[in-house]
Structure formats: structure tokens, C-alpha cells
């Protein structure tokens, strides 16, 4: 295969695709150059069908630090585990690709995206999604694409496709939409309380752009695409299927309609165990025993799948007896835990999430170092899904892709209503512990997070609630479901999560198992979700009407002071010596930003006050006409040096000690004396002159002695300064 290059212009940037030059041993590969971002995508497929009961698709998105001209950190100085952003991007690509493989396809497929060069204004994520679809489409892997995806922004009332970094910073919308040329099949979004109408329009605008990219892919596939390989699909024995359906379908139908989750699972499992036992005995000596028993398990799964869908589409009956637009029973509680900074427990049917709030100084914020310039992340929402939440045993360890994705969705939903840093200078962490799950646990974590924030006194702009919508589709006949449970998610065609306030949507996420959904279905799903969201908000507001006016007693208190930027070095000191001393002495935590905002944190208000006093003293400046209670620290023949405060001294010239003539300074003051002085002058070098006599009653004019000073004498002429501060009595570290 020889190198071929295809070019177009998309969203104002050149899009270049190269094939036939690199990674030629993969089933399909492409280099996508978008702006100055370059992504290599390679797609490969195993030769044989995998043995599991699912399609083993793996999508990776690898960020190479050299792509942004950055040197890796850490001891090994090389890339380690994927960043959170890389993990989320891999999920973003996986989700629209997965539905495009045939039912029963079980060969392992890997799609590896490597970012080779990075342009922050030309999304490598969208280039990787384009490259993933293209590499699969031009390969011999039986992929029913192509698909494509775009980012959509909303600035000044206009939609922008693949916005630049600058445009993203002011956009009210951060939307990724993917799909085929006929329909949308994946959505991921955060929004600043936008209406359903605006969100729907954004989705449709995005899909129009997707169609352009698909047309470009089809042109490339026509030129360099391979013929598709013949692969074995998982098929069950039709005679065996007919036999099992005839004998056991009525039993399974009854089991599926048991309303309570655990009882329903027990009933369906009992039927499956009965059937399995019968056929294990019947075919115990058969040479294809393993294949037959695999078919039995698959047939039983298909029977349960078909019955759940039939009940909903034909009888309009859900497994737990609810109406199609009915929410499960709701419950909300705040202050579930003592000592923590805030907590909320939210229950929807058999799905339950506990959210716990922790507030910290801004110095505790997460530092994110990826391809973008290093930045600090103020708000984190972490989601944990232990196996006991579904009554099972299983793996424990670091969070997987699903947990990272669900945490990020909650983070997007809630960060839109957080107060600004100026209003609330804290780092904020929410942890959602899923205690029970029967579907829609990510949305329960959002509701619990709202409760925890409000209980903890975080002044959010409005409460946020989330709901998961489902879809059962049979050709033109479809049913949109409100608040889907686990069974409906597993056997349904769509998981459409919508979170927001009463004013509008703050987050969207959609995954589907069919090839796409129409604008009509999206409109209906958004309308039903709004109704459900308002019902949940009613409960949240009844539980806690507004954020509490004060933080929890255990939360760190904060006080802020503003200092001049040129004084920052005084407070920090050489090598951090001064600020470390303040922290050690008072037990507080101190953050100073580049604009001179000093934030002091502690659970002890007295410690905060002491630290403020020390810092104020460090940056304090003497002012003309101000009076100070000072201490005499040095005596010279021309006057006395007094300490006004901290490291600021002033000279009281001998002529300013008293109204009467003074021949000897020590006749008026001694070292260690405390005196009141008034600042009368500060010269260009910051040297301070003060007077004692101006604060004393002036004697009658006739008694006033005549002073004869040398012509042109300045009180600082003979000033040599303190031991370590020769230049000026005003000193800085």
C-alpha cells in the first residue's frame, strides 16, 4: 500500500488524512492532522472469536508528553498510567463505536489512538474519534460505520463547531456529539443552565457537522478501503431455542414481572438454574457440551431481554409496575454523618448514594499536568461503586473507567452552580459512595452532592438534580422511560442522563445500543426529564431550602487580606523562611496568589487572627501624620532611633525630642523607653523621620528657646542604620 493523502477544511482548520505510510501491519491505520494536532490511530482484530459473553472492544487514547514539547515528570521520566482526561476521551470514542458492530460479534478489537503533536486550538480528541472510525472503516474489520464526532460551543447566542481554547473559556456550553450520517448515537455535555430548546438545537447543529465528516470518510473509504473479513458471529441453535422457549418462556415471563429487584433476580435465576440443570443432564456426554451450554445461557438471556421489551412496548408495563413516566419512591436526608464538612443521603427506589463534602485551603487543589499547560483544579467529584451495592462480590482497587466517567459527569453537573473563587475561596471535594444500585446511580450521586454542598454551607447558585431516561425501540414503535432501573438499562436501547436546575440543564450524557436516535425521541426524552427533574428538586428543597449560612464547625475557617504585590516577597521571606515561621507559630495554612490575595485557613479563629496580625505587621508601612507608640532602640548624638512596628524604625532628631533645647539625647530618652511619636516625613528611600515634641503642649512663645542648627543639616546625614540594615530604617526581607 502506498501513501495517500486526503485534504479538506473543517470548522475553519485544515483536516489532512494520511494512509498507507505508517502502522501498515495493523488491520487499518490512519494519521489525522487537524490544525497542528496529529493523531495516529491503529485498529486491529483477533483472528478468533473470544470465549466471553460480551464484545471485547478496547479503545485507548494515549497522550505523549513530547506532543506538547513537555518533559515528563516523576522518577522514571516517562509517561505512566493514562490521565483522567485521557481515560474520559477513550470512553468518549468507545461509546459511539461500540453500537456499530454486529450483534453476536465476539472477536477482540483494539483501537489505539496516539497523540503525536498537540495544538490546543485544534481538538486532538475529535481527531482521534475521526481516526478511530476511519481506521476501522478502511480495514477488513466488519465495522458498520463510519461515525464522527464534534465539539459544540455556545458564545454570544451562536453555536461554534470545534471551538478554540479562547472560545471555550467564554462558552456557555461544552458539548460533544457523535453519530452516523442518519442519527446521533452519543452525547456528552456540560452547560451553564441552558434550556432544553437550546440544547436540542446544539445537538442538531452538531449532527449537521458530523455529516460533513462522515462524507469525507466515505470518500477516503471508497479510495483505500479493504473488503470486510468473514467472521463467525455468535448464533444459537434454532431448534434448541424453539424447544426452550416453548417449555420455559411462561415461567420466565412470570419471574420478570416480580416487582422487587432482589426477589425478581432470585425468581429469574431459579428458572435459569432449572433449565441449565435439565440440559446439563441431557447433554452430559455430548461432544459439543460446552457449545450447547453456552447456547442455553444465551437463549435464556435473549428470552429475558425479549420479555422485558415486550412488556414495555406492548403492555406499557415496567418490571416494577411503574408507569413509563413515573419516578421510583424518593427520600433525602442531610447531616447523615457527624464531624464531616457536609453530607447528604439520597435514595431513589433501590438506588442510594451518600455524598460527603470536604473543604480545604486552595493550596490543596489538584495540580493537573498533561498536554495542556499545568493548572489547578479547584473542584473534584469522585464516584465509588463497591460491589456490595449490587449484592455481589468482585474486584476492589483503583477506580475503573466507569467510575471515573460517572464522577466526571457529576462534576460537570455541579460545577456550573458553584460560587466563584472570590465568593468562596476553598478547594471543594465531593465523594459519592454508592450504597445500593438498581440503575441511575450517577444521577443519585448528583442529587446527594447537592444535599452535601447545601448542608455544608457552600453558597451554590441553585440546587441540581439528575435523572436517567431510557428507550425501548421496535422500529417506528418506541417508548421513552423515566428513571430507568438496572434491568431497563441492561435490556434497553438508551441511557440518557439529564442533570440541571430549575433554570436549565447543566449536564447531559447519552449512550445507546442501536445505531442512532432521532430528534423526535430526543425532544420527548428532554421534556420528560425536565418534569422528573423538577419533582426531585421539590424534594431537595423541602429537605434543605437553601445553603446554610455558616460552615460546619469542623470545616476550616478562612480570612483573607489584600497586600501589595511588591510585599509578597516580604511575607514569604527568603526560601519561604518567613511564611514557614508564621505557619509554625500559629498552626494555620496560608495561600498567597500572584495578585496579593492572602488566604488564611484554620479551625481556630484566634490562630487566624494572630497570623493576620503578623502578616499585617510585615507589610505595614509608616504614614506621614500617623501617631505610633514606639520603643527607643538606639541612641546617637544627633537623635534617637525608635521602632514603630516590626522592622520599621524612625529617627527622632535631637531637635524633635522636646520644645526646649536639648543638648544631650539621653537627657530626654533612654534605650528601652516607650514613647509616642508622630511621623513627619518619609524620604524617597523610605527613611522615616518622626517627632516627639509635636505631640507635647507647645510652651508660650516667649519661653521658646532659639535653636541654631548647622546650615543644610539633615537629620539623616549621620545615620548609619541598624547593624544588618545600612540602607534604610525601613527594611524588607
Curated annotation (Swiss-Prot):
It is an enzyme of class 2 (transferase). GO terms for biological process: mRNA catabolic process; RNA processing. Keywords: Cytoplasm, Magnesium, Metal-binding, Nucleotidyltransferase, RNA-binding, Transferase. Mg(2+) binds at residues 489, 495. Residues 691-733 are annotated as: Disordered. PROSITE patterns: KH_TYPE_1, S1. Belongs to the polyribonucleotide nucleotidyltransferase family. This is Polyribonucleotide nucleotidyltransferase. It comes from Streptococcus sanguinis (strain SK36). The lineage of its organism: Bacteria, Bacillati, Bacillota, Bacilli, Lactobacillales.
Amino acid at each position: 500500500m502506498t501513501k495517500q493523502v486526503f485534504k479538506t477544511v473543517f470548522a475553519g482548520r485544515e483536516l489532512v488524512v494520511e494512509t498507507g505510510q505508517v502502522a501498515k501491519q495493523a488491520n487499518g491505520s490512519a494519521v489525522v492532522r487537524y490544525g497542528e494536532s496529529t493523531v495516529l490511530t491503529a485498529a486491529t482484530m483477533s483472528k478468533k472469536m473470544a470465549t466471553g459473553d460480551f464484545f471485547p472492544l478496547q479503545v485507548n487514547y494515549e497522550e505523549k508528553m513530547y506532543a506538547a514539547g513537555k518533559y515528563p515528570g516523576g522518577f522514571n521520566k516517562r509517561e505512566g498510567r493514562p490521565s483522567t482526561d485521557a481515560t474520559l476521551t477513550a470512553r468518549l470514542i468507545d461509546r459511539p463505536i461500540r453500537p456499530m458492530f454486529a450483534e453476536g460479534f465476539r472477536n477482540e478489537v483494539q483501537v489505539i489512538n496516539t497523540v503525536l503533536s498537540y495544538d490546543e486550538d485544534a481538538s486532538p480528541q475529535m481527531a482521534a474519534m475521526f481516526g478511530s472510525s476511519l481506521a476501522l472503516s478502511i480495514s477488513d474489520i466488519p465495522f458498520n460505520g463510519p461515525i464522527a464526532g464534534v465539539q459544540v460551543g455556545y458564545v454570544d447566542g451562536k453555536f461554534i463547531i470545534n471551538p478554540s481554547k479562547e472560545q471555550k473559556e467564554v462558552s456557555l456550553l461544552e458539548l460533544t456529539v457523535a453519530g452516523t450520517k442518519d442519527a446521533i448515537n452519543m452525547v456528552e455535555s456540560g452547560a451553564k443552565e441552558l434550556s432544553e430548546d437550546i440544547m436540542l438545537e446544539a445537538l442538531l447543529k452538531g449532527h449537521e457537522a458530523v455529516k460533513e465528516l462522515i462524507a469525507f470518510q466515505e470518500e477516503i473509504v471508497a479510495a483505500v478501503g479493504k473488503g470486510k473479513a468473514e467472521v463467525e458471529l455468535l448464533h444459537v441453535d434454532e431448534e434448541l431455542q424453539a424447544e426452550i422457549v416453548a417449555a420455559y418462556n411462561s415461567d420466565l415471563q412470570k419471574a420478570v414481572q416480580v416487582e422487587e429487584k432482589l426477589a425478581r433476580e432470585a425468581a429469574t435465576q431459579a428458572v435459569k438454574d432449572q433449565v441449565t440443570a435439565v440440559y446439563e443432564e441431557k447433554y452430559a456426554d455430548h461432544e459439543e457440551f460446552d457449545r450447547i451450554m453456552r447456547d442455553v445461557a444465551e437463549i435464556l438471556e435473549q428470552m429475558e431481554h425479549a420479555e422485558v421489551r415486550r412488556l414495555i412496548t406492548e403492555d406499557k408495563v415496567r418490571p416494577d409496575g411503574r408507569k413509563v413516566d413515573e419516578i421510583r419512591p424518593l427520600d433525602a436526608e442531610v447531616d447523615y454523618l457527624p464531624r464531616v464538612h457536609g453530607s447528604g443521603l439520597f435514595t431513589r427506589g433501590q438506588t442510594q448514594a451518600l455524598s460527603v463534602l470536604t473543604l480545604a485551603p486552595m493550596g490543596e487543589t489538584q495540580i493537573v499536568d498533561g498536554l495542556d499547560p499545568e493548572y489547578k483544579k479547584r473542584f473534584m467529584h469522585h464516584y465509588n461503586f463497591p460491589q456490595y451495592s449490587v449484592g455481589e462480590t468482585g474486584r476492589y482497587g483503583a477506580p475503573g473507567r466507569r467510575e471515573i466517567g460517572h464522577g466526571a459527569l457529576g462534576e460537570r453537573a455541579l460545577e456550573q452552580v458553584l460560587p466563584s473563587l472570590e465568593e468562596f475561596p476553598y478547594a471543594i471535594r465531593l465523594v459519592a459512595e454508592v450504597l445500593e444500585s438498581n440503575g441511575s446511580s450517577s444521577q443519585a450521586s448528583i442529587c446527594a452532592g447537592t444535599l452535601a454542598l447545601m448542608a455544608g454551607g457552600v453558597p451554590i447558585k441553585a440546587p441540581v438534580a439528575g435523572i436517567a431516561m431510557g428507550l425501548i425501540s421496535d422500529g417506528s414503535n418506541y417508548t421513552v422511560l423515566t428513571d430507568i432501573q438496572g434491568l431497563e438499562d441492561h435490556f434497553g436501547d438508551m441511557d440518557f442522563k439529564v442533570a440541571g436546575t430549575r433554570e436549565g440543564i447543566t449536564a447531559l450524557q447519552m449512550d445507546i445500543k442501536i445505531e442512532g436516535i432521532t430528534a423526535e425521541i430526543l425532544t420527548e426524552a428532554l421534556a420528560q426529564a425536565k418534569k422528573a427533574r423538577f419533582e426531585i428538586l421539590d424534594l431537595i428543597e423541602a429537605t434543605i431550602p437553601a445553603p446554610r449560612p455558616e460552615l460546619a464547625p469542623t470545616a476550616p475557617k478562612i480570612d483573607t487580606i489584600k497586600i501589595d504585590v511588591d510585599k509578597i516577597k516580604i511575607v514569604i521571606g527568603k526560601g519561604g523562611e518567613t511564611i514557614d515561621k508564621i505557619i509554625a507559630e500559629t498552626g494555620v495554612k496560608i495561600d498567597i496568589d500572584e495578585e496579593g490575595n492572602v488566604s488564611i485557613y484554620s479551625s481556630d479563629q484566634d490562630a487566624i487572627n494572630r497570623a493576620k496580625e503578623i502578616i499585617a505587621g510585615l507589610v505595614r508601612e509608616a504614614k506621614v501624620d500617623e501617631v505610633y507608640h514606639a520603643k527607643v532602640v538606639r541612641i546617637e548624638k544627633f537623635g534617637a532611633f525608635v521602632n514603630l512596628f516590626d522592622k520599621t524604625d524612625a529617627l527622632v532628631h535631637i531637635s524633635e525630642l522636646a520644645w526646649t533645647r536639648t543638648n544631650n539625647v539621653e537627657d530626654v530618652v533612654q534605650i528601652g523607653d516607650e514613647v509616642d511619636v508622630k511621623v513627619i516625613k518619609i524620604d524617597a528611600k523610605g527613611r522615616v523621620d518622626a517627632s516627639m515634641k509635636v505631640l507635647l503642649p507647645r510652651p508660650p512663645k516667649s519661653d521658646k528657646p532659639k535653636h541654631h542648627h548647622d546650615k543644610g543639616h539633615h537629620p539623616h546625614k549621620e545615620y548609619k542604620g541598624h547593624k544588618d540594615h545600612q540602607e534604610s530604617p525601613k527594611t524588607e526581607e
